[in-house]
Structures are given as C-alpha cells and as structure tokens.
Amino acid sequence: MTYSSDTVTPTTLGTGTTEARLNTDSPIQVPDGISNIVSAIPYFVPVGVFTPDESYLVRVRMQSNDISVEPCRFMMSGVNTGDAAFTSVQAPILQEYSMNIPNANGANMNIYGQCLTTNTAAPFLGCELVYSTGSTGSQQYWNTPDSISTGGTTINTRTTLNTITITDGREITSIGMVVTPTTAAASTHDVGEAEFTSSDFQVPFPYKFPIAPSFSGLGAAANQLTNPNGLSRQKFPAGHGIPLAPRALINSFYTNRDAKGVGSKVVPFLSFTR
C-alpha cells in the first residue's frame, strides 16, 4: 500500500459567516489509482492583521457527488486574539481528521470552510488530503450542531449546548469541543469541562473531559494565547467507542470554571462509524 497527499489552493472565507468552497471555488480531484482518502488536515493562512476580540472559529465540510461522504462536518482548532493593542497570536498545531473514505479513485471532492463568527480581516483556509492505494479502516463520519452556543459568565455555570443527531450510526469514535473567547480580558481564562450524554448511548457510562484551556495575561492589552492543541478531543479505538441506537440524539454541555465578562463561543463535534 502506498500513501500520497495533495493540497487545495488556500481560499478566503470572507469576513462574514457564509460557507465558501476552497480551492478557489473548485473541487479537488482524487488521482487515478487512489482507492482511499485517509484523512484531512485543514490549515489557516492569515494574510491580514488580527483584530482585538475576534477569534477564528471555523467549521470544515466535505462533500462529493461521486462518492458517499456525508455527513462530514468538523471543527478546526480555535485561534484566540486578545484585547486592545495585543502583541501576539499563537498558532495551534495542525489537526488530522480521520476519514477512510473508500472508492475514491478519480472522485471530485468539494471542501468548504465556514467562519462561525465574523472577522474584520478575512482568514484564508487551505486543506491537505492524505490518500492511500489500500483500505485504512472503517469510514469515519463527522458532525457538529448547525449553530454555535455561548458559554456562561458566572463561574461554574453548566451550559446546555446545541444537539447533534446521528442516523444509522454504529459507534462514536471521538468526541470533541472547541471554546474560543468572545471578548478577551486581563486574567480571565477559558477553562472547564465538556460533557456528552444521550439516552441513545447503549452503555451507562460518563463521557466528560477538560476543554483545551487558554489563559489571559495582565493589563489592557492582554493576550489570550491559543492552546497549542486549539481544541479538546477524546478518541476511542475502533470497536471500543460508544455504541449507539439506530437514531441517536446527542446532548452536550460546557461548564466554565472561571467567570467571564462575556460568555465564550462553544461548539461540540464528534465522529462515528456506520
């Protein structure tokens, strides 16, 4: 088995929240001889100034008219800025999202990006696809809620987030959450726990884990530096995930462990097999 990879042309997502197709609004064609899309690795390409109190919070969607892909919507790592004349922005590591999409030979893939918050300076987004000539495991499907949620302002507030529905799922293979500040302020941090529950889980166990924390410094120009991971994700080995009912409604929650002047933006996401 041989591996290969290709990238799309980085494309602007605009300053609003409208979904944009990458590769300058064109599909990327999988090469002949490739049978499997192993994974996707999206990446930010900032080309303008970052703006105070404007974080990057972006969802990626993959679609094809040639092969079965959807649902395939997942969250990128968040990127935080700071307050007033902040001096630096920290880039998170690249995240790889397992796909294992079969029958990909010659298929046209459409890759979309969507900012879930507005930005004064439009971010650009690129994406790498990793290919193989053989199977690399069960196909992974991804989903998020349709819209973002806002966390609490009072310390220790447990916020109910928007739900995710899975149809014809066999097991959840990962659960994750992205939290980015709406407004950065000195000595005000994003810390806390994510929690996933459902009466459609076929096991009675808890699924709770810490978010990727980010901390703010002192002064009016406080930076709230991005966590190196940019998101928090719990992965389960194949065959050892969360077993599901044929149709499952997934609830999620975020508990903020520090007071916030303005609630942070929160988006859960997950992957599953069929």
Would you name each region that the model predicts?
Residues 1-274:
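Beta-strand-centric surfaces of beta-sandwich/beta-rich domains
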